A protein has these predicted regions:
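Gram-negative outer-membrane assembly/targeting C-terminal domains
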Residues: 233-246
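N-terminal mature ectodomain segment of secretory-pathway/periplasmic proteins
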Residues: 27-101, 128-136
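Acidic/charged, solvent-exposed loop-and-adjacent secondary-structure segments enriched in E/D, K/R, S/T
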Residues: 95-122
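Short, conserved active-site entrance elements at the starts or edges of catalytic domains
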Residues: 112-147, 167-170
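Short, basic/low-complexity N-terminal boundary segments at the transition from targeting/disordered tails
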Residues: 53-55, 59-68, 113-123, 163-175
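Gly/Pro-enriched, hydrophobic low-complexity segments
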Residues: 141-235
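Bacterial N-terminal signal peptides
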Residues: 10-21
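N-terminal secretory signal peptides that target proteins for export/translocation
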Residues: 1-7
Length: 246
């Protein structure tokens, strides 16, 4: 009789624990503004981020040589490698090939460069996403993530924030750069530089056929050097674009 009671008691505890686990998994998502407030605090706070006016990032691309990225507040960016230079002056983008041929950058093609040169852009996420909605928690590599969804006309961008560190871990973009394919950016290996926390590894992947992955390993980051605005402007054909500090 006692054994029967014990078995029934154990059974009830098993059901109760299962219900608790289900309730935890089914917990409502955290509010968007709470997730964002935790993120801003984790990277150093508004004051620390907003005092930065420019950035030079030197990185090695895995199996792809060295690249130098420049960012000038609010959204001018320049990427310089041995064979190519790509810039965005805040209005239009361009690419200068090794043969000094200048081409117009396709719509939205500047976004991946902005994400590399200024990963802290998401501190002011409301500047470029008109609508932000909470989503059920996700998981990356066994770690729980808070998720925010920014819908667009074709699909949505999903942003994953580590539930423990509150740092931005991943951005899955669909419908902005491409109507058909998903582009993913993973931010890894955060370190403190000048009072803010920045990723020192940025991994790009895409579902686009033939699209190349890119693994950016950052070597140095320098803030608040003087950068001339014309270095981000579209050059004339044959003109050499000079980058670096002024």
């Amino acid at each position: 009789m006692e054994a029967g009671k014990l078995m029934r008691t154990c059974g009830l505890w098993t059901v109760a624990l299962a219900q608790l686990a289900f309730s935890a998994d089914a917990a409502p998502p955290r509010p968007v503004e709470t997730i964002l407030a935790d993120y801003v605090k984790a990277v150093g706070g508004y004051q620390a981020v907003d005092r930065l006016t420019s950035r030079e990032t030197v990185a090695d691309v895995h199996h792809g040589g060295r690249v130098t990225l420049y960012w000038r507040k609010p959204n001018q960016v320049l990427s310089m490698s041995k064979n190519e230079r790509t810039g965005y002056d805040g209005t239009r983008g361009w690419t200068l090939s090794k043969k000094r041929k200048v081409k117009k950058l396709a719509r939205g093609a500047e976004v991946p460069i902005e994400m590399d040169a200024d990963p802290l852009r998401y501190v002011h996420i409301h500047d470029f996403y008109g609508e932000l909605n909470p989503a059920p928690p996700g998981e990356i590599d066994g770690e729980r993530m808070d998720v925010i969804v920014a819908p667009n006309n074709l699909s949505a961008t999903k942003l994953y924030f580590d539930a423990r560190s509150h740092l931005l871990r991943r951005v899955d973009e669909s419908g902005e750069v491409s109507a058909y394919f998903e582009n993913r950016v993973d931010y890894l290996d955060y370190r403190e530089v000048d009072g803010v926390r920045l990723p020192f590894r940025i991994l790009h992947t895409t579902t686009e056929p033939g699209g190349a992955s890119e693994d950016l390993r950052i070597k140095t980051i320098t803030h608040n050097m003087a950068l001339q605005p014309e270095m981000f402007s579209k050059p004339q054909a044959g003109q050499v674009v000079m980058g670096g500090r002024r």
